Amino acid sequence: MNTALTIAGSDSCGGAGIQADLKTMTTNGVYGMSAITALTAQNTTGVSDIYEVSPEFLEAQLKAIFEDITPDAIKIGMVSSGELIKTIACNLKKYNGKNIVLDP
């Protein structure tokens, strides 16, 4: 089975972010994994709050994933700070991430 990692924010309403990515992966027969960059309070009308995870916690998530199951593809969505971008870049280089898609 193909594997994919989504690195993005969590959408409390389920229509975007990690939740939407995992639904899409499952529908297409892909084993999905996630590293959460932020928690959002949102619904179909908008985003009311964002809680960004620390770079250290994001790095811990990525380490846990890459040291167990190497993803065949990686999708990067919501990243709300330069520090998180640096953390992602360093870890994708460290673990030789491949087939990377950026979702603006």
Q: Where on the chain are the PLM-derived regions?
A:
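Glycine-rich phosphate/dinucleotide-binding loop and adjoining beta-alpha-beta core of small-molecule
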Residues: 49-104
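Small-residue (G/A/S/T)-rich helix-start motifs and N-terminal tracts that mark the onset
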Residues: 1-73
